[in-house]
Amino acid sequence: VWKTFFMKDGVWLALAFMLLYRLPEALSVKMLTPFLLDPPEAGGLGLSTAQSGLVYGTAGVIALTIGGILGGVYAARKGLRKSMWIMALSLALPCAVYLFLALVQPERMWIVYACVVLDQFGYGFGFTAYMLYMMKFAEGEFVTSHYAICTAFMALSMMIPGLFAGWM
């Protein structure tokens, strides 16, 4: 199974894609909780754990789900190849909302909610393309095993950058 996976056409390009596609999210997600909870004088937003849970764990999850569903609809209509750039940008660019939040330090919670919802919606929308790409790449004789290998690289793509996120 391993041999057939690494003999697939374009395997090294596919692995580079799998390892780099989620890089912005991999770097930002590890620092998100400290950013939300740290006091403003330390560069954070000073949210309580309840506020953080509500904004990220509730509003964010709802936006992520809606983004994923709409990403699937979009990719089904346009095709994965035609939609890849839009979906990749929708995953990467919303991470900039945290730069905005860090610079502005808003006191109004609705601004924080709107930014987190935008980020999570974009992540859900863009992540759909990533999943579809792995499904497409895994096609062939050992589709289930090859997809499992792809998901292992997906996990690795979040773990390795996460190790360095706090130093940046």
Predicted feature locations:
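Juxtamembrane intracellular "pre-TM" segments in multi-pass secondary transporters
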Residues: V1-L13
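Transmembrane alpha-helical cores of Major Facilitator Superfamily
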Residues: L19, L54-I62, L89, V117, ...
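Short amphipathic helix-loop junctions that connect adjacent transmembrane helices
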Residues: Y21, K30-S52
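Small-residue (Gly/Pro/Ala) motifs that create kinks and tight helix-helix packing interfaces
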Residues: T33, G71, P161-G166
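Loop-to-transmembrane helix entry/capping segments in MFS-fold secondary transporters
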Residues: T49-A50, G140-C150
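Residue-level signature of mid-helix packing/kink "hotspots" within the transmembrane helices
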Residues: V61-I69, M158-M159
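Helix-to-loop junctions at the C-terminal end of transmembrane segments
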Residues: I66-W85
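C-terminal transmembrane helical hairpin of 12-TM major facilitator-type secondary transporters
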Residues: K82-Y130
